[in-house]
A protein has these predicted regions:
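Conserved phosphate-donor/acceptor-positioning beta-strand/loop module used by diverse small-molecule
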Residues: 100-102, 114-135
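Hydrophobic anchor at the beta1->P-loop junction of P-loop NTPases
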Residues: 5
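The conserved Walker
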Residues: 9
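Small-molecule kinase domains that catalyze NTP-dependent phosphoryl transfer to phosphate-bearing small molecules
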Residues: 135-190, 195-202
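ATP-dependent small-molecule kinase phosphotransfer cores
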Residues: 30-97
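Walker A/P-loop
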Residues: 14
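Post-Walker A helix-loop "phosphate-sensing" segment adjacent to the P-loop in P-loop NTPases
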Residues: 22-28
């Protein structure tokens, strides 16, 4: 079973993954060819794997990715004409258990490309809660720009989320990331709990 934590920016997705990783759970990292200074300080807390453009081209040519697309916040990167990409390699997906994605990234995936059983952890936090995290963590990207882009995906998000074969969904709103991490951890250790949890949290 693969566990994919889904939510808009500032929902606490990465905090959940960090807690799990500290407990020994294997968490996959996305890649980007965006320079480390920008990836670390502005976009994803340094949680991307840094790849060269050559690496990105090889992944693309070998079709060795779960998703890959041009970096969606390119309008904020006006310092260079270089194209930047982000994605999740097939190797990372096959060798880890937990992943973090935005709705925008999930829409880049063909449901047929995922053969494993999947449990989506949907962190549907309110704008107020996400704004609080944005200011508390002193994030520096444009909240309104990110909100505008990600909000476009939400209208068809629910239907798409349930379109994956062999998928389960756990839904949380404004939940403490530590509690979400504890539930994922228990599911990884005791997979038979999945039916109880999906019935309780849908």
């Amino acid at each position: 079973m693969k566990y994919i934590i889904i939510g808009m920016h500032c929902a606490g997705k990465q905090e959940v993954a960090d807690i799990l990783e500290n407990k020994g759970i294997k968490c996959g990292r996305q890649f980007t060819n965006l320079e480390n200074t920008f990836a670390a300080n502005i976009y994803n807390g340094g949680n991307y794997e840094q790849y060269t453009m050559k690496d990105v081209n090889e992944i693309f040519e070998n079709n060795a990715y779960i998703f890959m697309h041009e970096f969606p916040w390119g309008n904020e990167l006006n310092f260079s004409p270089i194209k930047y990409y982000e994605g999740l390699s097939l190797y990372e997906f096959e060798n880890n258990d937990v992943f973090v994605m935005s709705p925008h990234q999930l829409f880049s995936i063909s449901p047929a490309s995922i053969k494993d059983d999947v449990c989506f952890i949907w962190m549907d936090n309110t704008k107020k809660e996400r704004l609080n995290r944005y200011y508390t963590e002193k994030r520096t990207y444009s909240f309104s720009n990110r909100e505008e882009i990600e909000s476009k995906d939400m209208n068809s998000f629910v239907k798409f989320l349930y379109g994956f074969d062999k998928s389960r969904v756990l839904y949380f709103t404004n939940e403490d990331p530590a509690r979400v991490a504890a539930i994922i951890y228990s599911l990884i250790k005791y997979p038979d709990l999945i039916n109880i949890y999906t019935e309780a949290y849908n």
